[in-house]
């Protein structure tokens, strides 16, 4: 072998040994996990079926708390309801940091309410929660907006006259319009060209973030960022969305009336003006843009995708659909709109919606957290800034809380008397949770209350007016998602809405 080749190999081996020795794992007492390779981490343990499948397999060997090296960085995985709640609720402050999502980090850069950390996050979170509540989070004003959108949807579905259609677009329209009315102060017609482009960007971006390519990027972003891939299209899409938001902000500035704020953007602009003399204020243009993008994106895709899964499940299990419609007929009838007050009188319908969220498992791997200080957890010392992934799928499919964790069965949310039964394992959107309008956990999804209202009112409004059918027999309907990464993308399907 040539001396130059031997020298190169020796230098490479020495470099890899230095990397292994200097690994941050030595700074703490991390949970057990598979032995990593220098630079590659645990790539060899990653199943082609996706990151979630790999993590579930590793849990069987290492338990509910284990370490996986995503490329060169150690990440602690939390599995099971009790483990997740012990960390993110029992030690909420320590686990309240936000970890990095590599495919969107170049856009957000720790700005905005979802990806911010420290005092910036606390300030933006307080402001956003208060503002969303002022504009009716869980109150009548948002209920009326959802009811209005539900009626627009019903009229649109009547036009189909029972012909098969793909519901993806319409479900995006209704959920996007609700969040648009709160954030931008307006709703769009379903034929509006700008609106259609925004919806296309949302769907494509969520699909790309959930792709296998993006999962690989999370492992080796430091290297792969220099090459073409899904991450570049994601950044391009997010920039186009930001361009639209920027134009909207400028229109708001030109028409702002301080005595009558119209929406989230107006209230933020007023706060910016109030604190413009404060050099350390977090109310600046960058945080406004990223907060609006976060609310806009999450407020559209999570609810619309849940509805998409929900009606596929209604086609798969027609006996469930019939029971929901029977309850709708008994409680609401056919001559008035469903209201949020109806929910407490409709435990079966509410249980079905809960089970749709649980079974569809939309965000199987929760958005990463980060410990804000050196943290002792279950005998392990996690150094400050250690990333932590809550595997929400392991809670939603937890056999300690659900008798049939891998089956669709709404009865799992009903007690012996037929009343709705709440479960601590029900964590469909985030590691926060709402019980009787009280949040549990620090990183609760800001729009969760709105999403709950949307799902109930849209779901019952549709089944009040339509029966659903498919040309595919229920037993042949495939529930396998198209993509399953950070999020799940349901399969496309055709559905007939038949007027009742």
UniProtKB/Swiss-Prot annotation:
Documented EC number(s): 1.14.14.1
Catalytic activity of the protein: an organic molecule + reduced [NADPH--hemoprotein reductase] + O2 = an alcohol + oxidized [NADPH--hemoprotein reductase] + H2O + H(+)
Broad class of enzyme this protein falls into: oxidoreductase
MF GO annotations: heme binding; iron ion binding; oxidoreductase activity, acting on paired donors, with incorporation or reduction of molecular oxygen, reduced flavin or flavoprotein as one donor, and incorporation of one atom of oxygen
List of residues that carry Phosphoserine: 128
Cellular compartments per GO CC: endoplasmic reticulum membrane
Description of what induces expression: Up-regulated by cannabidiol.
CDD domains (UniProt xref): CYP2B (cd20672)
Keywords in alphabetical order: Endoplasmic reticulum, Heme, Iron, Membrane, Metal-binding, Microsome, Monooxygenase, Oxidoreductase, Phosphoprotein
InterPro entries: Cyt_P450 (IPR001128), Cyt_P450_E_grp-I (IPR002401), Cyt_P450_E_grp-I_CYP2B-like (IPR008068), Cyt_P450_sf (IPR036396), Cytochrome_P450_fam2 (IPR050182)
Transmembrane domains' residue ranges: none
Residues in coiled coil: none
Membrane topology term: Peripheral membrane protein
Cofactors (names): heme
Record localization: Endoplasmic reticulum membrane; Microsome membrane
Residues annotated for heme binding in this entry: 445
Function: Cytochromes P450 are a group of heme-thiolate monooxygenases. In liver microsomes, this enzyme is involved in an NADPH-dependent electron transport pathway. It oxidizes a variety of structurally unrelated compounds, including steroids, fatty acids, and xenobiotics.
Family that this chain belongs to: Belongs to the cytochrome P450 family.
Protein name stated in the entry: Cytochrome P450 2B10
Lineage: Eukaryota, Metazoa, Chordata, Craniata, Vertebrata
